[in-house]
């Protein structure tokens, strides 16, 4: 089956499939990639996608959806410079792992250590510290200078006293990112000045009502549904899987956080860095007043659908931020 431009029956702008559709073996599209060719679940119905370039003048326009390539992803990575010290390369602080999931501490710390970072500072529970040091001997334990945080990976919901203490520690950290409800600009300035923060797994239910955009949340469909339900939305995991873009946008709207919705196609929703910038990414285009940026990545191998992959992702994000 060959689809012309897009498969029949899919939501062109949002990738949703709400009725009968015809899955394609090959989709031939024209001018630029349409959002549904990049967004699930419609993206799974496209087969092999071929773009016929009509040389449209798209420079200077903000794409509604951008597909990550190796080249434009590499442009965001800061390479070490000759005079860099460990502090100039960055210090990532991690509060991860638990008695039940000690491996999450190791995976998140090792991932951060291998992602171009100057120092790992680990502040998880005692049960995890020895195995973290065994796996990452350069890790530093305890409080100190931190330039980006990772919290929540492998942290269960209060199963032991150590878990309770760890959740209290994370909750105290998160209070510094809470935007005020009384429009006090001084309080908000403090939150915006905090370092980047990755909130994963067991810390998602501790997220304040509203946070600045340097807070990155990394839920899968079930975790995003729980976060939205706690904020009054009527949604479950299957709803998120059926309309992932809609619910990722809704989570960003409600919380202010940058939302990284994990899946076979990962969707990232956040504030655009510069709405006037040029982009070499190919994608569907929106008007110039768009206030969100949507980036998708679907190039990962299926073997990443395994326990621990989210812990590795969180550690890498903390190092990159």
What are these regions (language model features)?
Residues 1-37:
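Glycine/threonine-rich beta-strand-loop-alpha-helix active-site module
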Residues 24-26, 35-216, 221, 225-321:
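Small-residue (G/A/S/T)-rich helix-start motifs and N-terminal tracts that mark the onset
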